[in-house]
Amino acid sequence: AINRGILIDRNLKTSHAGVYACGDMAEGYDFLLKINRLLPIWPAAYIGGRTAGFNMAGQNTEYDGATVMNALNYFSFPLVAAGLVNLEKEEGYEVMTSLKSSMYRKIVLKDNRIVGLLYTGVVDRAGIVYGLMKDGIDVSAFKGELISPSFGMASMPEALRKERMKLIVNSHEKEKALQRA
């Protein structure tokens, strides 16, 4: 079945038995909006392709989803954006910004959860913030640190930091196990 793209479930199956779809032509799961929609970006296609491949090979694997994002260097000026970043006037959203020298950071929150990020100039650790956004982590205990140039894993409460590190280790172990299978 199709809408704006091929309709798929969280295992990337289509409405036809044995047929899977992902990438630019499929309506993948957007973890922020909690809906399936077109997400024509390379990371979503790559992860979707791996997930579809595992499912076609009999390894039941659920697609975690993606959201809109982009990273680029414009005349040696790096920029990373992900999620919902143009919501200044929307009710219920909190926007935090920081402008220092050649670095700009913007974090958009809803209910103490990150729903958007925009980094320019110095984009270090944007991946940490993206991970917090993807996993829907409540950042109320350290949200004031999010736009700091020194923000990193050490800025998080110890229990959360240990949990995040454990997730990273488990993810690498799962990846190795899937490659061996």
Predicted ranges, named:
Residues 139-181:
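Cysteine/selenocysteine-centered motifs that mediate thiol-based redox chemistry or coordinate metal-sulfur cofactors
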Residues 123-140:
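A short, polar/charged loop-to-alpha-helix boundary motif
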Residues 33-34, 111, 132-135, 158:
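Short, charged/polar low-complexity linear motifs in solvent-exposed/disordered segments
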Residues 1-51, 138-147:
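FAD-site-proximal beta/loop scaffold in flavoenzymes
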Residues 58-59, 135-137, 149:
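Short loop/turn hinge sites at secondary-structure boundaries
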Residues 25-127, 176-181:
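Mid-to-C-terminal Rossmann-like scaffold of FAD/NAD(P)H-dependent oxidoreductases
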Residues 3-12, 84-87, 163-164, 172-175:
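Short, mixed-charge, low-aromatic patches
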